[in-house]
Every structure is written in structure tokens, then in C-alpha cells.
Amino acid sequence: MQIGVVSDTHNNLKNIDIIISLFNKENIDLVIHTGDVTNANSLEKFSRLKCKLIGVYGNNDRNEKGLEEVAFKYNFLFQEPPNSINLCNRNIAIFHEPDIIDDFL
């Protein structure tokens, strides 16, 4: 399984397009976004991915309107950090702020 990880896209639509093209070209199986999408339009761009997208909200996402609606519309699994998933019998922690790791462990 190939996993793509991205963070802090901060509404940079040009870079998001580049990221999506790269992940699609490399046949990535899953993309994990570790926060700071910052805008519903940015998150909607990720609908062009040819794989599943999961992630957590970052510190700049909490007050943005529309992120939850876009995540629901495209079946993206976005949650408040910390979060974890089990892939290939491995637990993977997903969080935005590095100081949260002590609470997670």
C-alpha cells in the first residue's frame, strides 16, 4: 500500500493541483492530510484524487465554514485530532500539532 501524506496546504490551490497530480500519477492508495486545509474550496479540489482521503483538522481549520460539508459530500474522513487508523495491522497516529503526541500516547 502506498500512502501519501500532506499538511498545511493553506488554500494554495496551485500547490494542491500539483500534489493531486503527483499522487494520482504515482497511484497512491490513500492520502492522509494532517491539517490546515483552511478553506472548503481547497478541500473540494482533493475530490480529484483517485484514492481515499482521510485527515484531521488543523489549528487554522477550526473556524472555517464549509469544511465539514465538503468532507461529507466527498466521503472524506476528517476528524478532530488526534486520530488513528489501522492499516496493514499497523496503528498510525494522525495529528496536526506536535505537542499533542503526549496526550495521544
Regions found by a protein language model. Give the residues of each.
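Acidic/Gly/His-enriched mid-domain segments of enzyme catalytic cores or analogous surface patches
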Residues: 79, 83, 87, 99
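Short internal beta-strands
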Residues: 32, 54-58
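Active-site alpha/beta core segments
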Residues: 60-61, 97
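Histidine-centered divalent metal-coordination motifs
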Residues: 10, 94-96
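N-terminal active-site segment of His-dependent metallophosphoesterases
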Residues: 1-49, 62-64, 68-76, 80-81
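Conserved beta-sheet core of the metallophosphoesterase superfamily
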Residues: 54, 97-105
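Short amphipathic alpha-helix with an adjacent loop that forms part of the alpha/beta core around
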Residues: 20-24, 85-86, 103-105
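Beta-strand-turn-beta hairpins that frame and shape the catalytic cleft
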Residues: 1-4, 84-92
